[in-house]
Amino acid sequence: MQFLENLIQSISAHILPTACIACQRFQDESICTSCLNTLENNSLIYYECCYQCGIPLQVQELPNKQCSYCKQCSPLFDETYCLDRYDGILQTALHQLKYQKRIAFVHGLAKAWNHIQSAQLVSDDADYILPVPLSPEKLLTRGFNQSWEIARRIRLNMHTHKSPFILKRHHHSNHQAGSNMVTRQVAIREMFYIDAQYNKSLQGKSVIIFDDVMTSGATLNEIARILKTIGVERVINWVLLRTTRFI
């Protein structure tokens, strides 16, 4: 299946014009060199960010490499790595992928991650990478899970298993934009679960959770909670776009 997909992509690249997902200029690649350079120069990876939630740190927070929120509230995930700010050059492309079903854009988004983040994170010894799941209703409506479509194209160590079937979501919740962290955490409680057949194989393991957007961190914290409940040792978040303040 992957071979067939790569073949189709290769043929299409020689037949159809390609526009950069960020600047929309026609060229040969899904994201152009200029936009990759812009992204790399402004990527959150080069900023002093909270090791736990990935948000840029205030001056007074720099010594501990942890933001005041994480220090006070102690999220259950262990680390977070983010590619760029939510309001950066990839925001429009991500919106078009999700809401206009521009599925071809996953190639450019994955390429951006691989170009900038994979070299930094290639030594991560995680056992699994799991996408944040959509509800069955949302998956049926959209037709794909954007987090999985990006995650499965990310370069990883050979022993890291990718799967969209282990972590699942019960049902769709109302959009939580505008709600504070406490309200979001309550609304999403018990929303996710692990397919029971994988419980034993996850015990004592290190798991990466991939999400397209991180705002308050409530979703990722709830996922970390259920993973650690069944015995996962370490939970790391990989996030495409991060809001730079809590919403």
Predicted regions mapped to residue ranges:
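Glycine-rich phosphate/pyrophosphate-handling loop used in enzymes and phosphotransfer proteins
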Residues: M1-I247
